[in-house]
C-alpha cells in the first residue's frame, strides 16, 4: 500500500513526516516532504586562479565549502585533468554518499555554451565537451555554465535579490 511505501521512505530518511493538517471534516491527512539529507548537490567554480567547491542539501544549506587558491586555469590537457581530479577528490572526501548527489554544477570563467557544455576559450581541441569529460570522469550528472550567469542566478533565486522582481547583476573582476 502507499502508506507502507511512504513509511519505508520515512524510515530510510528520504521522506519526513511533517505532521497532520487541520481539515473541516474527516480524517486529518499527514503532510510529507523530502528530507534535507535525501539529496545533495555539488557546485564547482573554476576561476582563472582558484577553484571553489561546495556541497548543499535540498534547502541550500552549505554542508561543506572549500577553496583551492593554488589552481591556475590554463588551456592545456593537464589542466583539464587536474580539474577532474580535484572534483573527484572533493566528491570523495566531502562526507556525502555519492549516491545521494543528484547533480554537479560547474561554472567557469569566460564564454561558455551551457547547452553543449563547451568553453569557447579553454579546452577547445577536445572532441568531447568539458561537461562530458567531467561527467564521465566523476560519474555524476553535470551542468555547465558561465560563472557570471551562475552567480546572477544564485543571487536571484536564493541570495539578496530573491524577493525582487527585477535586478541588474554586474560582475566586476
Enumerate the predicted regions with their spans.
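Glycine-rich phosphate-binding loop and adjoining helix at the ATP-binding site
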Residues: 70-166
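N-terminal helix-turn-helix
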Residues: 1-17
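Conserved phosphate-binding catalytic cores of ATP/NTP-utilizing and phosphoryl-transfer enzymes
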Residues: 17-39, 144-167
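Gly/Thr-rich phosphate-binding beta-strand-loop-beta motif of the actin/hexokinase/Hsp70
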Residues: 28-65, 168-173
Amino acid at each position: 500500500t502507499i502508506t507502507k511505501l511512504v513509511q519505508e521512505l520515512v524510515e530510510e530518511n528520504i521522506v519526513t513526516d511533517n505532521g497532520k493538517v487541520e481539515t473541516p471534516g474527516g480524517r486529518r491527512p499527514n503532510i510529507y516532504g523530502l528530507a534535507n539529507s535525501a539529496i545533495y548537490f555539488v557546485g564547482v567554480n573554476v576561476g582563472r586562479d582558484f577553484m571553489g567547491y561546495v556541497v548543499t542539501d535540498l534547502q541550500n544549506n552549505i554542508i561543506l565549502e572549500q577553496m583551492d587558491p593554488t589552481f591556475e586555469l590554463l588551456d592545456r590537457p593537464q589542466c583539464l585533468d587536474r580539474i577532474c581530479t580535484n572534483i573527484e577528490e572533493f566528491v570523495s572526501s566531502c562526507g556525502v554518499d555519492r549516491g545521494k548527489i543528484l547533480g554537479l554544477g560547474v561554472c567557469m570563467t569566460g564564454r561558455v555554451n551551457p547547452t553543449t557544455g563547451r568553453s569557447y576559450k579553454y579546452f577547445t581541441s577536445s572532441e568531447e565537451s568539458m561537461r562530458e569529460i567531467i561527467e564521465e570522469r566523476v560519474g555524476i550528472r553535470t551542468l555547465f555554465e558561465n560563472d557570471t550567469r551562475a552567480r546572477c542566478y544564485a543571487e536571484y533565486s536564493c541570495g539578496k535579490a530573491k524577493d525582487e522582481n527585477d535586478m541588474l547583476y554586474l560582475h566586476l573582476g
